[in-house]
């Protein structure tokens, strides 16, 4: 009976880890098909941010320049002009299709992540007792570690998150989150997040050491600074 009670929180933890993947897999076909039909049949107002609007304007300007070039080539045979106009028409249709696919992709991923968040929040709310048991297990495990091991783990975690080589890792992680939510890759936004987020984490971590660890375990702070130096 005791083993069964101990196994239930562990099974609950595994289900939380794999739940988002399972939701994404279930919604992949049904939700995407519904969003595609909704987008293609209903005349929706398109909301564009400044970067997307600039990109669209640049593409339309390129198409306009091609049409102007078409007017300048009227001395060419009519058959060549018809082929040229047909190519421009195909490019325009292709551009519209790509834009629609991008909007559908964005709506689909945002909806999937929103559904996952709501379900996981409800799942966690109804399983507070199991989460409390898992939290007590983690605290007991960390408490039984020596101060040297704790200092080593803290140093390893901080070097991974806010160390010298961390910007590349943050760039990959933020880029993955952008892709998961269906957003386009914007270098300016990505650079801004990579340059500011580790700094904020570093400040929070130093404040945590000053306020919490100095009071709870001064020896751990001494060992941490000795290893860090």
From Swiss-Prot:
It catalyses: K(+)(in) + H(+)(out) = K(+)(out) + H(+)(in). Disulfide bonds: none annotated. Keywords: Antiport, Chloroplast, Hydrogen ion transport, Ion transport, Membrane, Plastid, Plastid inner membrane, Potassium, Potassium transport, Transmembrane, Transmembrane helix, Transport. The chain crosses the membrane at residues 6-26, 107-127, 152-172, 189-209. One of its GO terms (cellular component) is chloroplast inner membrane. It comes from the Eukaryota. InterPro entries: CemA. It is a multi-pass membrane protein. It is found in: Plastid, Chloroplast inner membrane. Its main location: plastid. Pfam families: CemA (PF03040). GO terms for biological process: potassium ion transport. GO terms for molecular function: antiporter activity; proton transmembrane transporter activity. The keyword Translocase does not apply. Contributes to K(+)/H(+) antiport activity by supporting proton efflux to control proton extrusion and homeostasis in chloroplasts in a light-dependent manner to modulate photosynthesis. Prevents excessive induction of non-photochemical quenching (NPQ) under continuous-light conditions. Indirectly promotes efficient inorganic carbon uptake into chloroplasts. Belongs to the CemA family. PANTHER family: CHLOROPLAST ENVELOPE MEMBRANE PROTEIN, CHLOROPLAST ENVELOPE MEMBRANE PROTEIN-RELATED. HAMAP family: CemA_PxcA (MF_01308). This is Potassium/proton antiporter CemA. It comes from Aethionema grandiflorum (Persian stone-cress).
């Amino acid at each position: 009976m005791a083993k069964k009670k101990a196994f239930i929180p562990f099974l609950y933890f595994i289900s939380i880890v794999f739940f988002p993947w399972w939701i994404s897999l279930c919604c992949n076909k049904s939700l995407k098909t519904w969003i595609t039909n909704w987008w293609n049949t209903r005349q929706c107002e398109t909301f564009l941010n400044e970067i997307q609007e600039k990109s669209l304007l640049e593409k339309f300007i390129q198409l306009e320049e091609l049409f102007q070039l078409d007017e300048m080539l009227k001395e060419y045979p009519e058959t060549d002009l018809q082929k040229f106009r047909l190519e421009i028409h195909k490019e325009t249709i292709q551009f519209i299709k790509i834009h629609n696919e991008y909007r559908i992709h964005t709506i689909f991923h945002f909806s999937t992540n929103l559904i996952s968040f709501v379900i996981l929040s409800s799942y966690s709310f109804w399983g507070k007792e199991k989460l409390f048991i898992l939290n007590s297990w983690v605290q007991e495990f960390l408490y039984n570690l020596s101060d040297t091991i704790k200092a080593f783990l803290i140093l390893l975690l901080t070097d991974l998150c806010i160390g010298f080589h961390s910007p590349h890792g943050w760039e990959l992680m933020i880029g993955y989150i952008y892709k998961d939510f269906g957003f386009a890759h914007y270098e300016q936004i990505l650079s801004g997040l990579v340059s500011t987020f580790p700094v904020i984490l570093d400040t929070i971590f130093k404040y945590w050491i000053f306020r919490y660890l100095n009071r709870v375990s001064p020896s751990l702070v001494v060992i941490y600074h000795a290893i860090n130096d």
